[in-house]
Amino acid sequence: MLISFSALVLASQLVIPVADTVPNFNEERECKIDSASAFDPNAGLNATIKRCMDDEQKAKGQLQTQWSQYAPSDKAMCTGLTTDDAATPPSYVELLTCLEGQQLVRKLPKD
């Protein structure tokens, strides 16, 4: 019985719940961390953060519009990939890029 329970516990950790709505990320935190490494000295830090925030909000809006068009398995995989690194905050741009890539892969001819 102990082995069955252990297998059940392990298997339950492999399931990534996928909501019917776009996940909620902290864009400001992501942009402050990202902008520090992608700093544009010609624009300044505030402009770099603003540009990042604009990109994140645009990607979030696109995700909100198109969320239902993505396959549940793609949403689960891409959400997991986007949120798996505790040191790097999740990004709507990365999530959107992953989902768009998955859609393109599905359109490739099958040999």
Predicted regions and their residues:
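Classic N-terminal secretory signal peptides
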Residues: 1-14
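Mitochondrial intermembrane space
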Residues: 11-111
